[in-house]
Amino acid sequence: MTLSSSKIALEVVRFSFRLGEKQILQEISFQVAEGEYLSIIGPNGAGKTTLLKCLIGIYTVGQGGIRWFGRPLEEYRRRQLARRISYVPQADGRLPPFTVEEFVLLGRYPYLSPFTTIRPWDRQAAQEAMEATQVADLADRLLETLSGGERQKVFLAAALAQGADVLLLDEPTTFLDYHHQAEIRALLRRLNAAGRTILAVTHDVNPAALDSQRILALREGRIAFCGPPEHLMQPEVLRNIYSAELLLMPHPSTGQPIIVPTALETNENQERLK
């Protein structure tokens, strides 16, 4: 997929964002094609989560512009935007006193007015979303009784029930063990293959390189890299993003370069060992 041959879902032009006295994002410009899978990586504090919150309108847009499907973000009403875009935050905040099914049904709110009761097809959409994320057997459990990984899957189920064209995901496999990480990654690949546009923040570069068509890397609030995974997975490029020396080896199945985690050496540590 190339941007020149595809319709543009998202266009960000010279966007900057300040939170209080701190400049979080600076001169951010990029595009995402409809049906593309873009991973967003970078060190802690680089501005990844803030970027997602700006893209969905949680934070007021500062300088520059954000356009979804050719329309400025600020022109969308909340329900209109929610029918096109689902945002899945990290499931580590305060939880409402809802059961899993009740929470997943919240994903249907863009299609309900204050005077509309939940309809059979809303429940069907919620059931299908719970089955896709393998939380259907938890339907009657309260959110507060779930593990971190289970909560993360429930948050994703609510986004799927929303039925939006775009998924904005903040660390979607956080708290999951390797088995469930693989299941969620496979689900996201299937959704992307079916036409969903996905923007996913992650700290794990290896899955990002294997799953996405392009990767955007932030460093200190600026774009340090934006391109295909094969251009990212080079020592000098990764060094510029993470200030670390990373050993790359071929993936045993695909042959693509992957990072060997135990080989990470920060520049600071190297200086200390001299």
Region locations from a protein language model:
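Helix-to-loop junction immediately C-terminal to a conserved catalytic motif
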Residues: I56
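ABC ATPase nucleotide-binding domains
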Residues: I241-K274
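The feature captures the beta-strand-to-loop junction immediately N-terminal to the Walker
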Residues: I41-P43
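Catalytic Walker B motif of ABC-type/P-loop ATPase nucleotide-binding domains
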Residues: L167-E171
